[in-house]
Amino acid sequence: MTAPVARQGRAGLASLDIIIVNWNTGTLLRDCLGSISQARTAGFRLERVVVVDNDSADGSTDGLEHLSEQPISFLRNDVNQGFAAACNQGAAGTQADYLLFLNPDTRVFSDSLWCPLEFLEQKQNGKFGICGVRHVDDSGAFSTSCARFPTLGIFFGQMTGLSMLFPTWFRSHLMLESECLESREVDQIIGAFFLVRRTLFEALGGFDPRFFVYFEEVDFSLRAVQAGFRSYYLAATTVYHKGGGSSQQAKAARLFYSLRSRLFYGFKHYSFLDAFALALLTLTIEMAARLLAALGSLSLSKLVETVQGYSALFVCLCTKRLRWRS
């Protein structure tokens, strides 16, 4: 594989394309696009905003073509292609120096686009291929912004609750606010705001479409490290992220795809023994813990969602619909 090169030294302003994958997000998409039109674009060229709609049924893309002064392109799929595949689809028709993969349940602020672009443009930052910013919620409080690469030990700590009881010994996958107070190099940027050099994105072949949703950015970030590029988190630049914009509508499906993508990640990147251990823990200890939590909450809907999510996973495993290795 030819190593991607940074953009430094090329003439003219850096250019940016924004890719948004939408699935039944209601008015969130409109708010997201509206915020882009208000963001600072001096110092770079915002070439295109591409919205890939994965067969939404709520009319969330209706009447948005002329919402912004920036050119907006809509790609409408007749079936839900999955998040990773739709991201690749949106990026395929663009040519800018940088790609920003942005969730429709986000809203950017004045410098949300410019600051990470400026960081990646600096010559001394050529080793960084991915950049992200601080995420905030409705109240303005910190929301998950970056993470460490998940190991079998990290997953075990999460499944058993040990990462909450003994966070010093059992670190969590998602980094805590106390770890994100200052700008720093991190393993992984959260995919809701994922700025990447086009050269790196193309060299890695984009996101792995076998991750229908979840873990696609974890996999990409790990492959970027293997190619010699790092991820950087900017603590002083923010973006609003609601979280769960579309997945809140189908919680059983969300659980299934989260577990499925996790297992696929394990079998793709771990040793076979560690991947097998991850699958065994997921299908025993974690399943029991989730069922007990649902029963303890006295929530029938939560119990049903858990049973449905795991049932779908068992069907997927039994029918060998997971292709573990490339």
What role is predicted for each listed range?
Residues 1-38:
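N-proximal low-complexity "stem/linker" segments adjacent to membrane-targeting elements
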Residues 35, 53-62, 79:
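A conserved acidic beta->alpha catalytic loop
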Residues 253-261, 272-326:
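Non-catalytic, C-terminal membrane-associated alpha-helical segments of glycosyltransferases
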Residues 76-94:
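Glycine-rich, basic loop-to-helix element that forms the pyrophosphate-binding segment
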Residues 99:
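Short aromatic/hydrophobic "clamp" motif used to bind/position activated sugar donors
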Residues 150-186:
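Short, flexible, basic/aromatic active-site loop/helix in glycosyltransferases
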Residues 181, 187-238:
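A short, conserved alpha-helix in the catalytic core of glycosyltransferases
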Residues 109-145:
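Conserved donor NDP-sugar-binding/catalytic core segment of glycosyltransferases
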